[in-house]
Amino acid sequence: MNAEELAIDPVAAAHRLLGATIAGRGVRAMVVEVEAYGGVPDGPWPDAAAHSYRGRNGRNDVMFGPPGRLYTYRSHGIHVCANVACGPDGTAAAVLLRAAAIEDGAELATSRRGQTVRAVALARGPGNLCAALGITMADNGIDLFDPSSPVRLRLNDTHRARSGPRVGVSQAADRPWRLWLTGRPEVSAYRRSSRAPARGASD
């Protein structure tokens, strides 16, 4: 399995990434929650909530491919968030990794997150996921399918998923582009942005 399996539309890529194994710096986890993001207005998947919506720049360059690259950014200037670039090379799209279940390296993840954090919450939420796996801004652009990368991804069998609106976005707030595995306690809670239109009034 390789990055070319993610050279597809972002929602299909999000489905493909659910259940994937992500490993970084002594911790291995299974992805249990993701969000899909598209790109520019004249692209195949216009998405006003995406960082790439207003075009390519130095910050979002990795979103434009090639697929399988890690796109990192800071949420509110604080928490590092990890995304997997998808779609054909040159087309903006990515999948945000929202939550994961720690499968190996729990002690190390706990040392990074804090001794009072419950096991199911170690990688719950995008910032916590990166903290648990030791993902930093320096990892931006790495090839997740390169065995020598500090953070690596392995696609597994597809899983049955539920879907709903994305968390905290004020644009395109009703799209069911957030996917999660049913019955997993590591999945984060849904919170609608206070700046989003009323339910049903957005795309």
UniProtKB/Swiss-Prot annotation:
GO terms for molecular function: alkylbase DNA N-glycosylase activity; DNA binding. Keywords: DNA damage, DNA repair, Hydrolase. InterPro entries: Formyl_transferase-like_C_sf (IPR011034), MPG (IPR003180), MPG_sf (IPR036995). It holds the Pfam family Pur_DNA_glyco. Its EC number is 3.2.2.-. Signal peptide: none annotated. GO terms for biological process: base-excision repair. Gene3D superfamilies: Methylpurine-DNA glycosylase (MPG). Belongs to the DNA glycosylase MPG family. This is Putative 3-methyladenine DNA glycosylase. It comes from Mycobacterium tuberculosis (strain ATCC 25177 / H37Ra). The lineage of its organism: Bacteria, Bacillati, Actinomycetota, Actinomycetes, Mycobacteriales.
